[in-house]
Amino acid sequence: MDVKILDARLRDQLPHYATPGAAGLDLRACIDAPITLAPGETRLVPTGMAIHLADPGYAALILPRSGLGHKHGIVLGNLVGLIDSDYQGQLMVSAWNRSEQSFELVPLERLAQLVIVPVVQARFNIVEAFETTARGEGGFGSTGRQ
């Protein structure tokens, strides 16, 4: 799969999988100067990367980095970013400071992660009824807590 890099600043810090079992790779803030996110503020941050998956059997997800969310309250403004296989533009991260403290985002800081996932496009058929299952229409805790 070919991932194109738009920003030459990433040349020395190419995205990579940190371990053999890593599902995601880090996206960095490709900014020229630090950005301060005030409490409650949301800002679009460029990553310097463009992606064109081309294969409709794949999509990419932009997910938050757990450390930024837990330690600093920095999460994604849209919670999850979905990148369709036919998108060709630069990846942008919607950074949301949900904490009560300002947060300074510095150039090339790791801000989010990218995961490439398989996609199945469903067909829909109108039916008179579903086959009966043990669960039936039970939802929201219907199978118990333990």
Curated annotation (Swiss-Prot):
EC number: 3.6.1.23
GO biological process: dUMP biosynthetic process; dUTP catabolic process
Residues the record lists as binding substrate: 65-67, 78, 82-84, 92
SUPFAM superfamilies: dUTPase-like
Reaction(s) the record says it catalyses: dUTP + H2O = dUMP + diphosphate + H(+)
Pathway as given in its UniProt record: Pyrimidine metabolism; dUMP biosynthesis; dUMP from dCTP (dUTP route): step 2/2
Entry GO MF terms: dUTP diphosphatase activity; magnesium ion binding
Listed cofactors: Mg(2+)
Keywords of this entry: Hydrolase, Magnesium, Metal-binding, Nucleotide metabolism
General function of this protein: This enzyme is involved in nucleotide metabolism: it produces dUMP, the immediate precursor of thymidine nucleotides and it decreases the intracellular concentration of dUTP so that uracil cannot be incorporated into DNA.
Family from the record: Belongs to the dUTPase family.
Name of the protein this chain belongs to: Deoxyuridine 5'-triphosphate nucleotidohydrolase
Species, as recorded: Thiobacillus denitrificans (strain ATCC 25259 / T1)
